[in-house]
Amino acid sequence: MNLCSSGATASTTSLSSTGQAERSGGVPGGGAEGGGGDGGSGNSGGGGKANDGSAEAPTLCFAGGSGTAGAITGSAELTNANSPANGAGGASGFTGSGQQPTGSNGHSHLHNENNANMPPETRPKMVTVKHPESNKPKPTTKKSKPIQADQDVIKALQRCRDEGIKRLDLSKSSITVIPSTVKECVHLTELYLYSNKIGQLPPEIGCLVSLRNLALNENSLTSLPESLQNCSQLKVLDLRHNKLAEIPPVIYRLRSLTTLYLRFNRITAVADDLRQLVNLTMLSLRENKIRELGSAIGALVNLTTLDVSHNHLEHLPEDIGNCVNLSALDLQHNELLDIPDSIGNLKSLVRLGMRYNRLNSVPATLKNCKSMDEFNVEGNGITQLPDGMLASLSGLTTITLSRNQFASYPTGGPAQFTNVYSINLEHNRIDKIPYGIFSRAKGLTKLNMKENMLTALPLDIGTWVNMVELNLATNALQKLPDDIMNLQNLEILILSNNMLKKIPNTIGNLRRLRILDLEENRIEVLPHEIGLLHELQRLILQTNQITMLPRSIGHLGNLTHLSVSENNLQFLPEEIGSLESLENLYINQNPGLEKLPFELALCQNLKYLNIDKCPLSTIPPEIQAGGPSLVLQWLKMHSPYRQM
């Protein structure tokens, strides 16, 4: 029996441009690390493609769907940066936002304003399918079965057949079943079924022999029909967020595939048949339960992006070194014990994600990957890097070695940081920053040395003149050098959890400082020069031994957050009333603070006031319990300066 026999006549309308799938490719797992990064979950599976000039190719967009009619994008994995924000222009649609173009009646349609001036016979075909529920609010109770939606699918398929539609979008439509009549839409090149409730596809899906893009993400699929192998032109297949326990065997026979998304399923293994997909350029197996990646991966020599993050891999095959075109390799959040030496063959590698594994070392052959711009091994057990490795990677701009077991800076001297602008060594066991280590790092703007064992800062700290963010929290620092005054580009300075007894007067030179965190030190007095920090927005002095605030604090006109809790304050200066921007004030747990200045009532923007465990004898308890607005009102009412 021929499943594909029908009386339908294929449309003679042709798609004027090919290669849609190739142009719609992207780097998975964007987020902080891009291709090798820790991207978001990317549950949205929207459509959208670059305008291919095929204005004559009719499109059917189901009104209950997203209204997107283009190549598969969505999530952080495929995004068309050139897509128009308003969705006008027909197929040159969207980036997975789930928005749909609407007409005055709220129905989904595809429209190009330029078509209005075209003769009727030359205008592109447009089909609008009105969903009976499209203008009604979403029900608060879940329907047992969206019968009406399934009926509308039948109508949509009929129009697809009759109108010669090439792109069909049935996404986000509560569909449970795809009718067998889908076989009549043999001219389809793009089919979007994402975000439905489909449990299985009919065998007739294999009749769509012209299909190039197929989006099935965010459904409940556990398998695929064998007939899908007839779709020999299929380029892009999206199966993210389904219930696949294995890679369906039929996929290995789709040798035309260039992009395959299998993210967030229940896959435990990858068959050796993977080697047949030699045209793949992008493969995402992220967020599955895979324990082993076999040697077949080495046959995919055209791969440029491979994402196997968030699995249970302990080893990689040496064959990974055959994938010489890889530019993005994401291995983060696995259980990797080692990285094969063959990784050094990947000379096109730009992003390599190795965060949060069980690595104790990395291979010296990584020196060959000179195109890398980011090196990130956060959350492993590495004690040292191969000699001079970072210096060999001269293109590096970001280095993250946090949460490892480093006892000292990597060997390689100042040369290893020449082009670096961000260094993160948080949560290691480093007790010293070598003198002159940043002498060539003229672009260094961010340094994070939080949670180490530093007892002092290098004498050349004054040469770090381009530093913008400096985090030295949770160390054992006893003194801040006077040369800190030279860091005049500094905006964020974190010194919490140290052993500082005083702050140098030269702190007043840091005129761009926005955040100053001195929590949990042994500070008794703040310098008067603190009032020169006019850009300061957050001043955190919690848990010190401060007995009074300098009157110059009233000059901090941009201050929004002031925390002086858990100190030995005896009073607040009247000048605190000049802090017009102040929103949050923490003065709790100051056992010697018995009264508040009436001038505090001048802080009109104050939203939060914590005075817990302060023996305020002048303000009635019921007023204190009423919150900051009531306290401020009381202060104003009892002020000797009523006119204020």
Curated annotation (Swiss-Prot):
One protein family per Pfam: LRR_14
UniProt entry tagged with the keyword Repeat: yes
Biased composition, class Low complexity, residue ranges: 1-19
Domain of life from the UniProt record: Eukaryota
Chain intervals with Polar residues compositional bias: 99-117
Regions of compositional bias (Gly residues) in chain numbering: 26-50, 87-96
Keyword Repeat: yes
SMART domains: LRR_BAC, LRR_SD22, LRR_TYP
Renumbered residue ranges of the record's region Disordered: 1-60, 82-150
Keyword set, alphabetical order: Leucine-rich repeat, Repeat
Extent of the LRR repeats: 164-185, 187-208, 210-231, 233-254, 256-277, 279-300, 302-323, 325-346, 348-370, 371-392, 395-416, 419-440, 443-464, 466-487, 489-510, 512-533, 535-556, 558-579, 581-603, 605-626
Family statement: Belongs to the SHOC2 family.
Functional description taken from the UniProt entry: Acts as a Ras effector and participates in MAPK pathway activation. Probably acts as a regulatory subunit of protein phosphatase that specifically dephosphorylates Raf kinase and stimulate Raf activity at specialized signaling complexes upon Ras activation.
Protein name in UniProt: Leucine-rich repeat protein soc-2 homolog
Organism: Drosophila erecta (Fruit fly)
Name of encoding gene: Sur-8
